[in-house]
Amino acid sequence: LGLCCILSGIMVYVPFLRYSYMEQMIVIFTEYKPIVSPDHAYEFLGDIGAAYGTITMITYLFGGLIADKFREKNLLLAGSILMGLSSIWYGTVPGKTGLILIHVFYAIGTGILIWSAFLKVTRKMGTSKEQGRMFSISEMARSILNMLIGFLGVAMLGRAVIGDGSMDPQV
């Protein structure tokens, strides 16, 4: 359960980094590696979110079918690899098309591979009478892990902020 919660917590957190770190991402995409003009930066981040949301909504339709046909362990592993490789690519700050593709891969990883398998694993952990407790425990563990990941992100961001309030993306 612990590994599944870590995976599902990160899976939910990473595609939505733009909500927590919007201003920092604007600096990176307009100053550090200018791939979009400052006038269109917010629109670009919205386009990334729209690509992710649209594809995820479509992939959820197939996630349950895929989870019933393949072993959960294999789906979680494939989703982890896809999300990990996409996140490494994201860290290199590719161009516009690359960032949109990364979010399409995130949508496939979360919607088809990870989320349905995670729900199936959680459901299998207890009897029908224990389902409420199993899902409550998994949500609690996911929330605690998301909080810790958020603190780690803020700590890393704190190291990148210079004393005058500006950013040093090289850190």
Predicted segments, located by residue:
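Pair of pore-lining "gating" transmembrane helices in MFS-fold secondary transporters
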Residues: 1-23
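Membrane-interface helix caps of multi-pass secondary transporters
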Residues: 17-39, 122
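Central cavity-lining transmembrane alpha-helices of secondary-active solute carriers
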Residues: 47-65
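Primarily marks hydrophobic transmembrane alpha-helices of the MFS/SLC 12-helix fold
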Residues: 73-76
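C-terminal ends and interior cores of transmembrane alpha-helices
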Residues: 81-95
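Hydrophobic core of transmembrane alpha-helices in multi-pass small-molecule transporters
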Residues: 86, 97-113
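Intracellular juxtamembrane helix-capping segments at the cytosolic ends
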Residues: 112-127
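Glycine-rich segments within core transmembrane alpha-helices of 12-TM secondary carriers
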Residues: 132-158
